[in-house]
Design a protein with these regions (language model features):
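A short, Lys/Arg-rich alpha-helix, primarily the initiator
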Residues: 1-18
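Alpha-helical and His/Cys-centered functional microenvironments
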Residues: 13, 34-35, 60
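Short C-terminal boundary/hinge segments that cap the last helix of small helical domains
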Residues: 55-69
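Short alpha-helical "recognition helix" segments of helix-turn-helix
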Residues: 22-23
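Recognition helix of helix-turn-helix/homeodomain-like DNA-binding domains
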Residues: 28-42
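Short, basic-rich loop-to-helix N-cap that marks the start of a DNA-contacting helix
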Residues: 39-52
Length: 69
């Protein structure tokens, strides 16, 4: 699953969250957060945990699948 990194970083900035703090809030490792920010995919479970930590619906932070659109 691909996270919309631009939106994720905006939400982090708005909430004053560092990668470390987002990792703590979401229960996801800092390394995983860093990989996502650098464009890697993640599992739906990880995306969901990040969405919850950012107080967003999952659909708000996940990139839409343009191949099926």
């Amino acid at each position: 699953m691909k996270i919309n990194v631009f939106k994720m970083q905006i939400l982090m900035r708005e909430r004053g969250l560092t990668i470390k703090k987002l990792a703590e809030l979401s229960g996801v490792s800092r390394q995983t957060i860093s990989c996502i920010i650098s464009g890697k995919s993640c599992t739906p479970q990880v995306a969901y945990k990040i969405a919850i930590a950012l107080e967003q619906e999952l659909s708000q932070i996940v990139k839409e699948d343009v191949e099926n659109g």
